């Protein structure tokens, strides 16, 4: 995919910034196919455990909330102004999964060494067949295009480590995870299995009431307690686990005495929750701070400027 084509796609996807929220961008099917094929090549060449450097901005679930994705970039800076890591769950539930994933893939192609996207549990055919992405592809294009996305998703990396100290993934830890080398060795392309290391990295959840490992109410993977986090960090000489996968009221939430943080970047999730969204900025000393997308006022009230930016959260030193 040549540079002028990528630039043109990005320009059209960003044109709607000043339009009413929800305005669709209908790229051609061949453009989307090219986005998938080109990004798939780049993703496959990069490791399954990305080794990244601060400063970087980290974002949690987006779930097709394209207007909020644009707002995140307005606050954090549009690439290449800042380096980004997204933790997965780009599609399903929201109304504009296609615009969301297309912009992220386009930025991946344009800035392959500055823009990074991990796999979430929704970047999996058996899940996004049910929760909205398949239907959106079928309605706006065709089923064949959905299958092309599946091939691309099967090549997404599953974890990242920032400056050898902050381990990032979509879901959480796994009882099978003994060395980080195991993550590097997960083969790609691959579907997400029902059990095992890859499944846990995308599906597991922390639970303050659990010691060790517990059952997960989702019916998939496990929950893990604060003791599990502490032991894991000590064993691997890490400072922090950064994950997404759960709606949290303030857009970010600490666990296990600030040894783990959950990030969620889709405010007013599904229009049903009153949650904020957050992005976490990691500076070059590994200090973490948060930029918050506040939930909009209840419908019917006009809120100046939509989701306003609350002050960055208290900085958390990491070294």
From Swiss-Prot:
Chain residues that bind Mn(2+) 2: 89, 121, 170, 245
InterPro entries (alphabetical): Calcineurin-like_PHP_ApaH, Metallo-depent_PP-like, PP1_catalytic_subunit, Ser/Thr-sp_prot-phosphatase, STPPase_N
Hydrolase among keywords: yes
Lineage top rank: taxon: Eukaryota
Residues that hold Mn(2+) 1 according to the record: 61, 63, 89
Catalytically driven reaction(s): O-phospho-L-seryl-[protein] + H2O = L-seryl-[protein] + phosphate; O-phospho-L-threonyl-[protein] + H2O = L-threonyl-[protein] + phosphate
The protein's name in its UniProt record: Serine/threonine-protein phosphatase PP1 isozyme 1
